[in-house]
Amino acid sequence: MVRDSMAAAFRPSNRVLLQALQILVYPGVGGSGSVSCRCPLGAKRYLLTDNVVKLKEFQQKKVAVACNLSGTKETYFRNLKKKLTQNKLILKGELITLLHLCESRDHVELAKNVIYRYHAENKNFTLGEYKFGPLFVRLCYELDLEESAVELMKDQHLRGFFSDSTSFNILMDMLFIKGKYKSALQVLIEMKNQDVKFTKDTYVLAFAICYKLNSPESFKICTTLREEALLKGEILSRRASCFAVALALNQNEMAKAVSIFSQIMNPESIACINLNIIIHIQSNMLENLIKTLKNAAEGNLSKFVKRHVFSEEVLAKVREKVKDVPALVAKFDEIYGTLHITGQVTTDSLDAVLCHTPRDRKSHTLLLNKRMVSRRTFQPLSQSLLAE
């Protein structure tokens, strides 16, 4: 009871959070004016894995739908246009097929009109209904039409059509790739406005967007979202936390950066390792910094043990920091040489390291499970191995 009342007292209200978001995205509404993106453009990498975006599966389904279509695409489009003008009922299957047949901006314009009609006819019967949102956003992803997805997602007449987190996440990822961070933040605002549940991917995207905007306002948003998530009992991923740490460091919020970093479980990723070095640099912990690098360079020599890898950019910052301390410069130069010899230095910037998307674990599992029968005995592999 006491814990619940404390949480309620410290929980940021949606209104306050949304106001902060809107000030950042629409500077004229309030705040201190325009926001400049001070962080380097760096790697414009996607943040979502393939098993979330599912673009390949969508494209395969498009081919299958086109092959199974009775008649031509042009006839199908013409019949749908006729149904629109005659105010006839749009069926679920017709919209699904249409979204799989679209290949151009003009086709998407037709799809948008059909979506408006379909939603107007069915918005009161959405419980358990087919989720068209991800399908439309994947279509926009494929055709490079992110503005169409943003337009529909923000339209109040389509409230409830994009009721799933996947639609918002894929669109934010698409905008992130193109460096349209303010537009991505607008999508985040809309997601918050529509009370769509945030997932682990949402927090990664939200914190990455705030990190790229790199302003006092975006730092405030990131901090508020993080605190709100923790109060709800959400478990934030290591990737999300790394973006939050990097943003705090860029904003010279050292105490916050250290606090967030200390809460990361298993901080052994390349991003964590390099962020830890930056924390040491900005905290002037030079002796510990050199000791950390030395331990990494002289650690277990077994090829089966994963070694720590450091960004050349980060190591350059270390050298700049210790250049006025001759004893430390000598130690660093020796360690630097060892790290290069052992292959523990990458040319990737810290930004590229942060934005790197790990491969899907699911794909590895599928590869392992792909062949379940012995080619020699035609028995299940487990039985075959025992027999041999």
From Swiss-Prot:
Keyword Transcription regulation listed: no
Family annotation (Pfam families): MRP-S27
Compartments, as annotated in UniProt: Mitochondrion
Keyword terms: Mitochondrion, mRNA processing, Phosphoprotein
Entry's Gene Ontology molecular function annotations: RNA binding
Stored InterPro entries: mS27/PTCD2, Pentatricopeptide_rpt, PTCD2, TPR-like_helical_dom_sf
Record-listed Phosphoserine modification sites: S382
GO CC annotations, alphabetized: mitochondrion
GO biological process, one term: kidney development
PPR repeat windows: 166-200
Signal peptide start-end: none
Transmembrane segments: none
UniProt function note: Involved in mitochondrial RNA maturation and mitochondrial respiratory chain function.
Family (UniProt): Belongs to the PTCD2 family.
PANTHER family noted in UniProt: PENTATRICOPEPTIDE REPEAT-CONTAINING PROTEIN 2, MITOCHONDRIAL (PTHR14700:SF0)
Protein name: Pentatricopeptide repeat-containing protein 2, mitochondrial
